[in-house]
Amino acid sequence: LYWEDGKWVETKPLEIHKPLTYPEVGPKESYLLHHEEIESLVKNYPTIKRARFWMTFGQQYLTYLDCIQNLGMSRIDEITYEAPLADNPNEKVKVKIVPLQFLKAVLPNPQDLGENYDGQTSIGCRIRGLKDGKEQTYYVYNNCSHEAAYKETGMQGVSYTTGVPAMIGAMMFFKGLWRKPGV
């Protein structure tokens, strides 16, 4: 889902992808996804002609997603499972589970994986438009080392770049700094 010419355009999951080059990271296969941030952008800047969100995934991750989907484990509806009792395998009990919630319960907590992350995130915004009658393109970005983020907070870079700016914004708001001109 992305915004173009005043309307939302729907696509199939991971249908649109292409290599994009990220500063200090290099080229990565990038996938067009929906993200809440573009909803906020088009609401607050109604003259935007196109707003899209791209994200990268490693091939192994995409293979895991395909496997989870193919096994029916990405379902969010409740199913009934007939399970043998631990103390009496011959006796069975019917248990209701939501497959995706079950996966969440048995897979490692993402918070516990940060120590093994390496490399860096690269989050940016490419802005293209007219300024003084001439087409201009700007790219504002932030890179974050997973290792440095983990050393500082015990979290990997994606969590760091999500949580730290929100915390700083909240702190500035409550100290009255956010309301000053230019902020």
Tell where the protein language model's regions lie, with residue ranges:
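C-terminal catalytic/substrate-binding lobe primarily of soluble NAD(P)-dependent oxidoreductases
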Residues: L1-V183
